[in-house]
C-alpha cells in the first residue's frame, strides 16, 4: 500500500490509481464484496498517506462512498459480509467530511512513516 500511496504523487500513476479504485465501488457485484472492501481500505490508506490530490478526488466521490454505507450482501452461509464495508464506508465518509481530522490523520501518518524509515 505504501508504494501505491507514493505513486499518487506521480501525475500519470495518480490518473490510473484513482479511477481504478472508484471503478471497484460501482462496477463490482455484491458477491465481489472483498474487492470493494479492499478498495475502501486502500482509499483510506492513500487519503492518509498519499498526495493531497487523493483527498480532493476522494471528496469529489464522497457520494459514491456514502452509498456504500448501505451495502448489503449475505453469503451462502447466511453471514452478513456487508457489515465491514458499511462500517469502513461510514468511517471514511466521516473522515472526508472533516478537514481537521484529515489534517491530523495525515500528520500522524507522516510521523509514523518517519519512524519506520
Language-model features: where?
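Short inter-helical turns and helix N-cap capping residues of alpha-solenoid HEAT/ARM repeat scaffolds
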Residues: 29-32, 51, 82
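Short conserved catalytic/interaction loops centered on acidic-Pro-aromatic/His motifs
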Residues: 49-58, 104
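Alpha-helical solenoid scaffolds in eukaryotic proteins
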Residues: 16-23, 64-73
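Extended alpha-helical interaction segments
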Residues: 1-35, 102, 107, 112
Amino acid at each position: 500500500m505504501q508504494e501505491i500511496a507514493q505513486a499518487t504523487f506521480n501525475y500519470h500513476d495518480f490518473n490510473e490509481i484513482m479511477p481504478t479504485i472508484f471503478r471497484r465501488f460501482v462496477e463490482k457485484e455484491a458477491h465481489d464484496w472483498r474487492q470493494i472492501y479492499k478498495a475502501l481500505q486502500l482509499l483510506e490508506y492513500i487519503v492518509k498517506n498519499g498526495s493531497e490530490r487523493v483527498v480532493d478526488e476522494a471528496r469529489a466521490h464522497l457520494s459514491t462512498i456514502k452509498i456504500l454505507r448501505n451495502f448489503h450482501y449475505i453469503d451462502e452461509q447466511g453471514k452478513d459480509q456487508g457489515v465491514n464495508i458499511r462500517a469502513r464506508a461510514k468511517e471514511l465518509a466521516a473522515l472526508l467530511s472533516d478537514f481537521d481530522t484529515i489534517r491530523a490523520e495525515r500528520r500522524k501518518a507522516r510521523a509514523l512513516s518517519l519512524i519506520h524509515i
